[in-house]
């Protein structure tokens, strides 16, 4: 009707316009907002706004408490809008307008806002004057001012009360109240917003599109309200959301008949069971964390729901809760992970976590009001939830991979058992970009935990083998292995016993690297002879996967993929000759020093190695083994001949020989030795028998090798010993002459003085000889009390050896090393007296440095020494603690 | 003191009783084997000629087979006869 008046040429168009404007302005915004323009002192107003009141009792715009600013009616319908102030003089300056303005406002300042039709009519009038274009802008402006001056302050005021509340239920109520207040304040605006949108749709207003206006309003709202958010507010929100999640999770558990669906599935794990019972027994509610009697889970859920609804209506949901939700999720995921996964490699956690994530997403649906049948999932809502799920999953993969990467060294160490962890990690790595992190972290862990002098070579090799197995599962292209384990290979190259350890492992001699023997006996080994060079000869083209970016382009992918443990180990040195030579000398040692070798096993090993290294390099070893077999046959032959002879022609003692093909064995040390007459005769007899057996061939004895068992009969005791021929010969000279000077003996034996002295040390050790004065040796026919100590040692030593009970006794085969450990024992005692305490490795390396008493002694390896020392510990001649050996107090 | 030896396990290498180290034909050590063989000793024996030169049996046989007319010792060019 107003529009009609305009068209009819009504005499008071200005007045009519003003009336219309007043109608619209008072209709659209709450009167308080219009009062704003007046004295700035209003700015202090919100302080006076009544504080928090119980939910529901908040005043509505018309309620007396809020009516105070409206008591003086809005006289200025055009607040701070400079563009408007020019064409529209302030109503204050137009006295004639005042009454109608008052009239209009008095109508609205009552409980009843102007009817929609009235407003619409007024808008029509404005439209007639072309003013409709500014209406929206004005609306936003007013809202912004109101927010700045009143609402925001009021809201934060209410929030700041939370400092008085320590416990969560109260905080939650407060938050609810504060947002309720906010909503009630904004309610008129939102209502008007709807009207404006409607008019825009009807074409009354120009609008920037309805969506534009709404967005603008919400942006303003968020901008002004959260222009500066106090830290404490964020913290409170976060704490409450954390609680909400826990309450929700707990309620889900309870909701399904009291059993915990999550725990049910995993009650088989002892850990989970323990945790479950702890939960049952705890007096506190797992959800809200308060006493079970005072559990407020139910209220909490309701209140959270209300809060979410309020926030949703205000479009503040994302703004207020997104950050808190994110932080909470991160925190909870991390906690859960630390709690369950750390150190636990033997089962996969992926499925469990996927289930858990689904439940978390259920919670998110609750937070963002997108679940429940009441609200049909709109595509938009679905996408939000999808986004969140994606986020949670990615976050989970990221930190799970991070955790596993951090623990990778331990995982690798435990490998066959930790396979689930490796597979989890593989799955996660495919989804996160943490390859570099993995490489760096693993390398660092290797450097600090493995590659230092404190670790046995054999342990390093064992770990390397596990790493090969584990990382192959993780990365079939083997690039991670290649890159991360390069330090191990580099380091192993610097250890001198690497080859020996690997070879020993291959032949199943050492305990630590037994895997290698198994690996060796696997069928279809990758031959080291012919690296498969052809690039794409194997597999379906469909299955082809490119190499990772960090692969070394210089190496062919298929070769890398096909390399197995043994070829990787052997390639540490880049050449297999080293290994073959080492194997050969190791085999020689075993054959010559351990008369108790097992031919079948050695033959099997050689055959297996032939598969790997090829026929030709192993040829020498084959001949060596054949020599052993031939020798046995020849010995049996000769023995048979001997037995046919009459008793008087029988040799005084049995002579047996291992007859070697010199060209095929590693070179031997050649020691000259003048053998006493009777022995030489016996050996020559044997030699003649051999010559008879094999025409045109003869024997050359190697006295440094071999084993002589004999009884040494002294006045008061008899020793039964097994020594090398040289040692035996030396003692034999003492039979005829009880005392020798070193020089004399050296001339007779034809052995350099220094060497002779070393050889004789065994007998000094045994208490058979003594050096008195220096350089003169004589037989100790009767033991003197001060020598008794060492004699006791020997007795106990031999006893436990022959008993064969312990590990040590099995390892230190008595008749092969004979007196050797005993010899070491003096050295060890001297070392420990001087240096107090030493580790096994230290003792070993010092022995190797100082004790060079012949091949038989150099033979002892770390394990044997360890066995020997352990025996000493058992006999209480040594004390072992904290990784070092020391002498017991009384002994020193 | 009396030492009573119970058992003497010695180690020895075998060698051909020959006046040379290497086979004059293949230049390999007598104590090794000829290039065609894998195992020395019984499987790759030496033979002596009446000229007192000796060779791996396989080597000299190969040589003799290659000789068209008369069979000479490759070292001294005397007629080759196996030493009985």
From Swiss-Prot, chain B:
InterPro entries with a match to the protein in the record: RING-box_E3_Ubiquitin_Ligase, RING-H2_APC11, Znf_RING, Znf_RING/FYVE/PHD
Listed Gene3D superfamilies: Zinc/RING finger domain, C3HC4 (zinc finger) (3.30.40.10)
Zinc finger (RING-type): 34-77
Keywords, alphabetical: Cell cycle, Cell division, Cytoplasm, Metal-binding, Mitosis, Nucleus, Ubl conjugation, Ubl conjugation pathway, Zinc, Zinc-finger
Molecular function terms, GO-annotated: cullin family protein binding; G protein-coupled receptor binding; ubiquitin protein ligase activity; ubiquitin-ubiquitin ligase activity; zinc ion binding
GO biological process terms on file: anaphase-promoting complex-dependent catabolic process; cell division; positive regulation of mitotic metaphase/anaphase transition; protein branched polyubiquitination; protein K11-linked ubiquitination; protein K48-linked ubiquitination
CDD domains: RING-H2_APC11
Main location as per UniProt: cytoplasm
Pfam families in alphabetical order: zf-ANAPC11 (PF12861)
Post-translational modification: Auto-ubiquitinated.
Binding positions for Zn(2+) 3 per the UniProt entry: 34, 37, 44, 58
Binding-site residues, Zn(2+) 1: 23, 26, 56, 59
CC annotations in GO: anaphase-promoting complex; cytoplasm; nucleolus; nucleoplasm
Residues noted as binding Zn(2+) 2 in the record, renumbered to the chain: 51, 53, 73, 76
Pathway(s) annotated for this protein in UniProt: Protein modification; protein ubiquitination
Annotated compartments: Cytoplasm; Nucleus
Subunit structure: The mammalian APC/C is composed at least of 14 distinct subunits ANAPC1, ANAPC2, CDC27/APC3, ANAPC4, ANAPC5, CDC16/APC6, ANAPC7, CDC23/APC8, ANAPC10, ANAPC11, CDC26/APC12, ANAPC13, ANAPC15 and ANAPC16 that assemble into a complex of at least 19 chains with a combined molecular mass of around 1.2 MDa; APC/C interacts with FZR1 and FBXO5. Interacts with the cullin domain of ANAPC2. Interacts with UBE2D2.
Function description: Together with the cullin protein ANAPC2, constitutes the catalytic component of the anaphase promoting complex/cyclosome (APC/C), a cell cycle-regulated E3 ubiquitin ligase that controls progression through mitosis and the G1 phase of the cell cycle. The APC/C complex acts by mediating ubiquitination and subsequent degradation of target proteins: it mainly mediates the formation of 'Lys-11'-linked polyubiquitin chains and, to a lower extent, the formation of 'Lys-48'- and 'Lys-63'-linked polyubiquitin chains.
Domain notes: The RING-type zinc finger domain coordinates an additional third zinc ion.
Homology family: Belongs to the RING-box family.
Protein name (Swiss-Prot/TrEMBL): Anaphase-promoting complex subunit 11
UniProt organism field: Mus musculus (Mouse)
Species lineage: Eukaryota, Metazoa, Chordata, Craniata, Vertebrata
Protein encoded by which gene: Anapc11
């Amino acid at each position: 009707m107003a529009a009609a008046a305009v068209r009819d040429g009504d005499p008071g168009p200005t007045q009519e316009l003003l009336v219309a404007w007043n109608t619209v302005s008072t209709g659209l915004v709450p009167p308080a907002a219009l009062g704003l323009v007046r004295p700035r002192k209003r700015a202090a107003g919100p302080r006076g706004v009544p504080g928090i009141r119980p939910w529901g009792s908040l005043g509505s715009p018309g309620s007396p408490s809020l009516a105070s600013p409206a008591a003086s009616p809005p006289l200025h319908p055009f607040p701070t809008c400079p563009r408007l102030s020019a064409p529209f003089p302030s109503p204050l300056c137009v006295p004639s307008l005042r009454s109608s303005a008052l009239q209009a406002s008095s109508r609205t300042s009552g409980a009843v806002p102007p009817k929609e039709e009235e407003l619409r009519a007024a808008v029509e009038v404005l439209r007639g004057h072309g003013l409709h274009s500014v209406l929206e802008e004005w609306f936003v402006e007013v809202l912004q001012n109101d927010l700045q001056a009143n609402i925001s302050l009021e809201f934060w005021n209410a929030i700041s009360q939370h400092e008085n509340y320590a416990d969560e239920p109260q905080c939650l109520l407060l938050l609810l109240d504060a947002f309720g207040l906010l909503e009630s304040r904004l309610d008129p605006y939102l209502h008007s917003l709807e009207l404006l949108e409607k008019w825009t749709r009807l074409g009354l207003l120009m609008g920037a599109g309805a969506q534009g206006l709404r967005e603008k309003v919400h942006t303003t709202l968020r901008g002004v309200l959260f222009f500066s958010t106090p830290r404490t507010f964020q913290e409170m929100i976060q704490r409450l959301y954390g609680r909400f999640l826990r309450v929700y999770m707990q309620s889900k558990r309870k909701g399904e008949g009291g059993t915990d669906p999550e725990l049910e599935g995993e009650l088989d794990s002892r850990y989970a069971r323990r945790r479950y019972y702890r939960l049952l027994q705890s007096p506190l509610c797992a959800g809200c964390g308060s006493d079970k009697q005072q559990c407020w889970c139910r209220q909490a859920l309701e209140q959270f729901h209300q809060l979410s609804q309020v926030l949703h209506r205000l479009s503040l949901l994302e703004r207020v809760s997104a950050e808190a939700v994110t932080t909470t999720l991160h925190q909870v995921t991390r906690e859960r992970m630390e709690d369950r996964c750390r150190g636990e490699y033997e089962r996969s956690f992926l499925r469990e976590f996927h289930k858990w994530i689904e439940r978390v997403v259920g919670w998110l649906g609750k937070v963002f009001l997108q679940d429940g049948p009441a609200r049909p999932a709109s595509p938009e809502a679905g996408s939000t939830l999808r986004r969140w799920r994606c986020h949670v999953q990615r976050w989970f993969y990221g930190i799970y991979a991070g955790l596993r990467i951090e623990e990778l060294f331990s995982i690798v160490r435990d490998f066959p058992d930790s396979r689930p962890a490796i597979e989890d990690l593989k799955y996660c790595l495919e989804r996160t970009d943490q390859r570099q992190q993995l490489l760096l972290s693993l390398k660092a862990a290797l450097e600090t935990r493995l590659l230092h002098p404190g670790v046995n070579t054999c342990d390093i090799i064992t770990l390397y083998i596990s790493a090969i197995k584990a990382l192959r599962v993780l990365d079939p292209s083997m690039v991670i292995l290649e890159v991360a384990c390069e330090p191990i290979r580099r380091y192993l190259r610097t250890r001198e016993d690497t080859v020996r350890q690997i070879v020993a492992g291959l032949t199943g001699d050492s305990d630590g690297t037994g895997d290698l023997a198994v690996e060796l006996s696997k069928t279809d080994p990758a031959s080291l002879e012919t690296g498969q060079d052809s690039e794409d000869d194997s597999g379906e083209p469909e299955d082809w996967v490119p190499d990772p970016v960090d692969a070394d382009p210089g190496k062919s992918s298929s070769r890398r993929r096909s390399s197995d443990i043994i070829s990787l180990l052997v390639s540490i040195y880049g050449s297999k000759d080293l290994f073959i030579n080492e194997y050969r000398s190791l085999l020689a040692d075993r054959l010559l020093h351990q008369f108790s070798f097992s031919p079948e096993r050695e033959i099997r090993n050689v055959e297996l190695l032939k598969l790997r290294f090829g026929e030709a390099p192993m040829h020498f070893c084959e001949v060596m083994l054949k020599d052993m077999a031939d020798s046995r046959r020849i010995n049996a032959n000769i023995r048979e001949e001997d037995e046919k002879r009459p008793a008087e022609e029988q040799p005084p003692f049995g002579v047996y020989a291992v007859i070697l093909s010199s060209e095929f064995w590693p070179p031997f040390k050649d020691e000259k030795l003048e053998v006493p007459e009777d022995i030489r005769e016996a050996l020559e007899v044997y030699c003649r028998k051999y010559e008879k057996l094999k025409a045109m061939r003869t024997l050359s004895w190697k006295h440094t090798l071999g084993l002589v068992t004999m009884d040494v009969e002294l006045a008061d005791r008899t020793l039964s010993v097994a020594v090398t021929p040289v040692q035996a010969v030396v003692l034999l000279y003492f039979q005829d002459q009880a005392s020798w000077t070193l020089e004399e003996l050296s001339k007779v034996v034809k052995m350099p003085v220094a060497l002779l002295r070393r050889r004789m040390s065994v007998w000094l050790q045994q208490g058979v000889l003594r050096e008195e004065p220096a350089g003169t040796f004589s037989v100790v026919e009767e033991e003197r009390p001060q020598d008794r100590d060492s004699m006791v040692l020997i007795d106990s030593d031999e006893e436990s050896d022959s008993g064969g009970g312990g590990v040590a006794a099995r390892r230190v085969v008595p008749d092969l090393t004979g007196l050797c450990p005993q010899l070491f024992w003096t050295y060890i005692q001297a070392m420990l007296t001087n240096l107090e305490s030493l580790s096994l490795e230290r003792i070993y390396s010092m022995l190797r440095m100082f004790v060079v008493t012949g091949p038989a002694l150099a033979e002892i390896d770390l394990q044997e020494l360890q066995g020997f020392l352990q025996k000493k510990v058992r006999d209480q001649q040594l004390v072992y603690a904290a990784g070092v050996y020391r002498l017991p107090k009384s002994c020193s | 003191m009396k030492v009573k030896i119970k058992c003497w396990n010695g180690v020895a290498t075998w060698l051909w009783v020959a006046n040379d180290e290497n086979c004059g034909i293949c230049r390999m050590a007598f104590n090794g084997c000829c290039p065609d063989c894998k195992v020395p000793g019984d499987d790759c024996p030496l033979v002596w000629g009446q000229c007192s030169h000796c060779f791996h049996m396989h080597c000299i046989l190969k040589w003799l087979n290659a000789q068209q007319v008369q069979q000479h010792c490759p070292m001294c060019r005397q007629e080759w006869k196996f030493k009985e």
